[in-house]
Swiss-Prot record:
The gene is pheS. Its cofactor is Mg(2+). It comes from the Bacteria. The keyword Acetylation does not apply. The lineage of its organism: Bacteria, Pseudomonadati, Pseudomonadota, Gammaproteobacteria, Lysobacterales. This is Phenylalanine--tRNA ligase alpha subunit. Its EC number is 6.1.1.20.
Length: 331
């Protein structure tokens, strides 16, 4: 019995000292396996005197049960410790600042265009769209451009080999709209246009918005009132405005609109912001509208021009350089 007691003490001490699951498994095999020391004790019960077998058997069974429980407890302890160590290594430091999501924003030209469209929508104008690759009829001929007009020259217009071209204005959308609708008409067209020009105030691609109204009793006074209301709504203040006579093939009379713009030094100067005029009778005839019954007015403006004025940008090219430092100001 003393041998069993000694074996119990050694075995429990070895179990408690095991540091890894592999060590613990090797110890289990050495104690409880087919060739283990506890199994050997059970096999020796037959050699004991009959009066000692029962007590020895009970002692060995108690030892086996104690070792089984100790092994299970130690295994659970080692597995828990291993899991804690792994979790500690993978732990997320909640005190570490998160990665900030970059906040996006609309491009200033897009902001400006949407603002202009919204203003004219409140005035009852319908937004229409058309192709950027146009034919000569919709871009020039239907709009009363004579064959010798400078705008048709290669240095002003991007032509394709088949005679088509990149539209130089959105006026072609007006022609298509008048072909598809009957008066009265109230529409605007906005989008990219292309001209062979590039400097501090010009870009080979820019955005334009044009408007058209055709009705039986439209006058230049209606045009003036419409544009005055638009300028006031866009800049959110009143301006002194003047309408200078000017020439555009598709309107007669035509005018350019200037506003009294305040300079940084406090002085004011006249600043051109858009062109306009009464729709030329030839344009109405080209789309099947009787100029004896209907009159109309049209206007056009450069969106980048208004964006430069609204946001105080001096160089048009800044809108197209994709400099994040510049664009972030509008996010």
């Amino acid at each position: 019995m003393s041998e069993i007691q000694s074996l119990t003490e050694r075995a429990l001490a070895d179990v408690a000292a095991a540091q890894t699951p592999d060590q613990l498994e090797a110890l289990r095999v050495a104690l409880l396996g087919k060739s283990g020391s506890i199994t050997a004790q059970l096999k020796q019960l037959g050699t004991l005197p009959a009066d000692q077998r029962k007590a020895a058997g009970e002692a060995i069974n108690l030892l086996r049960d104690a070792l089984t429980a100790a092994l299970a407890e130690r295994k659970n302890t080692l597995e828990t410790a291993a899991l804690d160590a792994r979790l500690a290594g993978e732990r997320i430091d909640v005190t570490l600042p998160g990665r900030r999501s970059e906040r996006g924003g609309l491009h200033p030209v897009t902001r400006t265009l949407e603002r202009i469209v919204e203003i004219f929508a409140r005035l009852g104008y319908e937004l229409s769209d058309g192709p950027e690759i146009e034919d000569d009829w919709h871009n020039f001929e239907a709009l009363n451009f004579p064959p010798h007009h400078p705008a048709r020259a290669m240095h002003d217009t991007f032509y394709f080999g088949d005679g088509r071209l990149l539209r130089t204005h959105t006026s072609g959308v007006q022609v298509r709209y008048m072909d598809a609708h009957k008066p009265p008409l109230h529409m605007i067209a906005a989008g990219k246009v292309y001209r062979s020009d590039s400097d501090q105030t010009h870009s080979p691609m820019f955005h334009q918005l044009e408007g058209l109204l055709v009705d039986e009793h439209s006058t230049f006074a209606d045009l003036k009132g419409t544009l005055s209301e638009f300028v006031r709504a866009f800049f959110e203040r009143d301006f002194e405005m003047r309408f200078r006579p000017s020439y555009f093939p598709f309107v007669e009379p035509g005018a350019e609109v200037d506003i009294a713009w305040q300079q940084p030094d406090g002085s004011t100067r006249w600043l051109e912001v858009l062109g306009c005029g009464m729709v030329h009778p030839n344009v109405l005839r080209n789309v099947g509208i009787d100029p004896e019954r209907y009159t109309g007015f049209a206007f056009g403006l450069g969106v980048e021009r208004f964006a430069m004025l609204r946001y105080g940008v001096n160089d048009l090219r800044a809108f197209f350089e994709n400099d994040v430092r510049f664009l972030r100001q509008f996010a």
